[in-house]
């Protein structure tokens, strides 16, 4: 058995920074050549520990920023203003659709924060007038539901 330090998450084995014991062949032929792990030494353990500490600090800062943005988005003043104008026929169907990019643009201007369109989760583009609920995934642990009102121009 050989001790290795994981530098990537490996299903069924562990996450980044974990010290695990694996068979020598698995380490030598798979984990180390693919860059998923490094051989365990005291120096490598200290180096990975430093990297992990820096990563945890970055993740904590990203989580706090996501929570701050979520607080801004859930304020009534921001969500009340989230209205999108679109060209529509008399039956209430849009000529075209409202996409995540359109929602991100309006949400960014209403909140004052840069919201990437990849963070907007909609099942399919919105093609009807009315109120629709959209999820905004700011962080894996922070999601916000926003009501989007689409009205005819």
Swiss-Prot record:
- Molecular function in Gene Ontology: rRNA binding; structural constituent of ribosome
Q: Which SUPFAM superfamilies match?
A: L9 N-domain-like, Ribosomal protein L9 C-domain
Q: Which GO terms describe its cellular component?
A: ribonucleoprotein complex; ribosome
An individual GO BP term? translation
- Pfam families in alphabetical order: Ribosomal_L9_C (PF03948), Ribosomal_L9_N (PF01281)
Q: Which InterPro entries match?
A: Ribosomal_bL9, Ribosomal_bL9/RNase_H1_N, Ribosomal_bL9_bac/chp, Ribosomal_bL9_C, Ribosomal_bL9_C_sf, Ribosomal_bL9_N, Ribosomal_bL9_N_sf
Q: Which keywords does this chain's UniProt record carry?
A: Ribonucleoprotein, Ribosomal protein, RNA-binding, rRNA-binding
Q: Which domain of life is it from?
A: Bacteria
**Coiled coil (UniProt feature):** none
Tell me, in a sentence or two, what this protein's role is: Binds to the 23S rRNA.
Entry's family note: Belongs to the bacterial ribosomal protein bL9 family.
Q: What is this protein called?
A: Large ribosomal subunit protein bL9
């Amino acid at each position: 058995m050989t001790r290795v330090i994981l530098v990537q998450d490996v299903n069924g084995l562990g996450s980044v920074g974990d010290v695990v014991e694996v068979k020598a062949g698995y380490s030598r032929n798979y984990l180390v050549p693919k860059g998923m792990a490094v051989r365990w030494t005291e120096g490598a353990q200290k180096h990975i520990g430093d990297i992990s500490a820096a990563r945890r600090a970055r993740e904590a800062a990203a989580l706090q920023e996501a929570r701050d943005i979520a607080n801004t988005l859930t304020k009534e003043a921001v969500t009340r203003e989230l209205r999108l104008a679109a060209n529509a026929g008399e039956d209430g169907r849009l000529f075209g659709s409202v996409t995540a990019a359109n929602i991100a643009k309006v949400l960014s201007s209403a909140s004052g924060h840069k919201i990437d369109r990849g963070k907007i989760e909609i099942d399919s583009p919105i093609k009807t007038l009315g109120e629709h609920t959209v999820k905004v995934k700011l962080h894996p642990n922070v999601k916000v539901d926003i009501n989007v009102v689409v009205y005819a121009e």
